[in-house]
């Protein structure tokens, strides 16, 4: 997996501008859904805002699929039978920029899908085709032991909430605020 096509060496020095540059360059890509990466990010954040989530959850929702834009595996790696581990890739690149209350839900939103499939077997039936396909690559529903451990995570509730908004944020042509409107909120959580 290579990040070279993003031309990181030419990205702005400012962390938020780097994030926006990645969205500008790769946000129009699709990942097996009927919305682009950018549309999905904005919708997921919008649903979190509508449901009264904390600002940290809103930022996590906005950035949760950042890792999808960082790999060069194509727009839907799951179709090729590949788990891109986008949740780990995104959280790793954002590490050092944001606190754990944002990074952990990003890192764990795939685990939250697996957890919800364990907790509510009917949940899997409501997943999009792309999410069901990737679920198989990501390990399927959690085991009892995995679920017990997952429920003890310090940001467990935020992880599950993000996952639910992630599932909702796939509405073609939904109107949302633009990416730049989140700049003050993102900057507020930067650790540098």
What are these regions (language model features)?
Residues 1-3, 17, 132-192:
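Metal-dependent nucleotide-binding catalytic modules
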Residues 47-164:
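Divalent metal-dependent catalytic cores for phosphoryl transfer on phosphate-bearing substrates
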Residues 1-83:
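Acidic/His-rich, divalent-metal-binding segments that scaffold phosphate/diphosphate chemistry
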């Amino acid at each position: 997996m290579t990040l070279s096509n993003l031309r990181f060496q030419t990205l702005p020095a400012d962390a938020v501008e780097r994030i926006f540059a990645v969205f500008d360059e790769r946000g129009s890509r699709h990942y097996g859904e009927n919305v682009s990466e950018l549309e999905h990010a904005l919708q997921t954040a919008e649903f979190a805002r509508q449901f009264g989530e904390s600002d940290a959850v809103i930022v996590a929702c906005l950035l949760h699929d950042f890792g999808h834009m960082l790999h060069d595996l194509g727009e839907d790696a799951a179709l090729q039978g590949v788990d891109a581990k986008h949740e780990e890739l995104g959280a790793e690149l954002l590490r050092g920029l944001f606190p754990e209350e944002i990074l952990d839900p990003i890192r764990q939103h795939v685990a939250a899908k697996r957890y919800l499939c364990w907790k509510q077997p009917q949940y899997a039936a409501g997943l999009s085709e792309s999410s069901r396909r990737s679920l198989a690559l990501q390990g399927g529903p959690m085991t009892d032991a995995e679920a017990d451990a997952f429920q003890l995570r310090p940001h467990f509730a935020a992880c599950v909430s993000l996952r639910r908004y992630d599932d909702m944020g796939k509405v073609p042509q939904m109107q949302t605020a633009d990416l730049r409107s989140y700049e003050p909120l993102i900057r507020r959580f930067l650790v540098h």
